[in-house]
Amino acid sequence: MFWRDITLSVWRKKTTGLKTKKRLLPLVLAAALCSSPVWAEEATFTANFKDTDLKSFIETVGANLNKTIIMGPGVQGKVSIRTMTPLNERQYYQLFLNLLEAQGYAVVPMENDVLKVVKSSAAKVEPLPLVGEGSDNYAGDEMVTKVVPVRNVSVRELAPILRQMIDSAGSGNVVNYDPSNVIMLTGRASVVERLTEVIQRVDHAGNRTEEVIPLDNASASEIARVLESLTKNSGENQPATLKSQIVADERTNSVIVSGDPATRDKMRRLIRRLDSEMERSGNSQVFYLKYSKAEDLVDVLKQVSGTLTAAKEEAEGTVGSGREIVSIAASKHSNALIVTAPQDIMQSLQSVIEQLDIRRAQVHVEALIVEVAEGSNINFGVQWASKDAGLMQFANGTQIPIGTLGAAISQAKPQKGSTVISENGATTINPDTNGDLSTLAQLLSGFSGTAVGVVKGDWMALVQAVKNDSSSNVLSTPSITTLDNQEAFFMVGQDVPVLTGSTVGSNNSNPFNTVERKKVGIMLKVTPQINEGNAVQMVIEQEVSKVEGQTSLDVVFGERKLKTTVLANDGELIVLGGLMDDQAGESVAKVPLLGDIPLIGNLFKSTADKKEKRNLMVFIRPTILRDGMAADGVSQRKYNYMRAEQIYRDEQGLSLMPHTAQPVLPAQNQALPPEVRAFLNAGRTR
């Protein structure tokens, strides 16, 4: 310890203070004369001050204790004290703190043997020492901070009481921290220790224990509700630590009671009276369902009741006795369930019904079918024919065979009448007949392009040329809304008759035809399932079909079909699949050798070139509609879009009937957004 240097420090103070502070000389001499010799094991002090300036007193104590003192200019006051017995260093330091406390000041120990003198009210924000349990290093008026854990009492309720016991000078402070249930005390060590002792005496758990009371007939939740209602008013003026607590355990059908022995005994007797066996014949209840269909829940509830009955009989040792009879029936017209069961099983079934009879979320599914196609066909050919020399004809591409064309032209020419005289002199006059144009008309009906015929004597040449360009851009957006886990089907198209068989009678007249109808158009079938969060799993079947044309046998259909299962987030656009098709081909029919001659060879051949390109993509986007507000928002957007289209067409009018009004959807109430209107409508129905 540094106390062996006290005498030297005091004499050094006396030597340096003779010139500037003569009035301190008696005090310094008194302190020096009252101190023990240098070789003493422990220094002792006596104090004799009368109307001494407070700053001088502080400086004297700092010199005696070999401490550096920091104090502001506002420190002022007078000190008068006289000790009758010698004081050791700790007693001397406590005397110093007591005198400062009486003057409204406190000492904050700093590093390097520095003492800081501050106002008592400002000491609580200084870096005070943090003490723990059983610490003896600080006592008296030393400023400290202590954290006290509280185990059985709420610090929120205890803190206001402790604040009333803090000194009035404002040097102390009490802060409670609810998450850890601890109290932080700041102030003089003696006050902090006194508050700690108060906390320890108050912080007792009391004679409270928990008791589990199993039930035989009643429902645990119902019994707990009744007991809570009975004890609610009677325990209003009791502290929280003395109030009884009642909790229902649905899993074991038991009631847990916490409190003192008298309270638990009272609750036990009351529970036994309430847990009496009821008449089983009249234990029936009707449950009116809000969202589910009663017929769909009957099978589920029968399975659940069977499991509950078996478990109860096994627990009671009455397996197979048939004592527990459960009956579940559905009323289709009122959408209600009629359940007859013992009370405990009835409560379990009621809980299951409440969890199943909930409003299921809906999913609005939008599909986007995009098809962009373009094609180009070019056909050029020359055919020759001679009545006597033969012919050169081609049938590739869109060429009309020259032989078939010549025969059709011959049939189309009118025939001039003739006069025939028989051997017996009879005269027969045949009238003029018109030509048959049906063959020629049928032949030309399927032709497009240019056909030029050149006739020279017995020779005829047919030159045909055609170019076809096609382009298409198709966007189909079928959409449908369905419940979660509910299959939905959407179809827009037509029924096309298809000949599947024909039976001819014995006289080969009036054949019997068998016709089936095939649906063509846009079809969407989807079953959504809402998963954890906002993910939607969808089982999708999508088809686009149309009539492509007709052959000599039957109708040709074009189909684009897709079947898959995907997972998408709410509002996310996901591609299901697609096709990118690019085709190019050429067909050449020619006369050998002659068709290979440059330039001239084109007179002896027919060429058909074809190029087609098609891009097909299918997208889908699910939107979860968890409540009426979301459903109304989607419906209003669709409704307003269709109404805007109708208003636009009505403004355009009909060219030949300009004054004819066209149908337009009625206007909706646009004063409020659809979400707000849905919320207000839901409130009116409550």
From Swiss-Prot:
Protein name from the UniProt record: Secretin GspD 2
First and last residue of the signal peptide: 1-40
Effect of disrupting the coding gene: Severely disrupts assembly and function of T2SS-beta.
Family according to the record: Belongs to the bacterial secretin family. GSP D subfamily.
Region (Secretin): 360-627
Disulfide bonds: none
Site, as annotated: May serve as a pivot that allows opening of the central gate for substrate egress: G493
Main localization category: membrane
NCBIfam families: type_II_gspD
Region (Cap gate): 414-433
Domain remarks in the Swiss-Prot or TrEMBL record: The N0 region interacts in the periplasm with GspC. The S domain interacts with pilotin AspS2. The N0, N1, N2 and N3 domains are periplasmic, while the secretin and S domains form a channel that is partially inserted in the outer membrane. The cap gate extends out on the extracellular side of the channel partially closing the channel. The secretin domain forms a double beta-barrel structure; the outer barrel has an outer diameter of about 110 Angstroms while the inner barrel forms the central gate with a small pore in the closed state.
Region feature (N3): 282-357
GO BP annotations, alphabetical order: protein secretion by the type II secretion system
Function noted in UniProt: Part of a type II secretion system (T2SS, formerly general secretion pathway, GSP) for the export of folded proteins across the outer membrane. This subunit forms the outer membrane channel.
GO cellular component: cell outer membrane; type II protein secretion system complex
Keyword list, A-Z: Cell outer membrane, Membrane, Protein transport, Signal, Transmembrane, Transmembrane beta strand, Transport
Subunit structure: Forms a cylindrical channel with 15 subunits, each of which interacts with the surrounding pilotin AspS2 proteins (also called GspS-beta). Interacts with inner cell membrane protein GspC2 in the periplasm. Forms multimers in the outer membrane. The isolated N0 domain forms dimers that self-assemble into rings.
S domain, contacts AspS2: annotated span: 629-686
Region (N1): 142-206
Miscellaneous: Encoded in a type II secretion system (T2SS-beta); this strain encodes 2 T2SS but only this one (beta) is expressed under standard laboratory conditions.
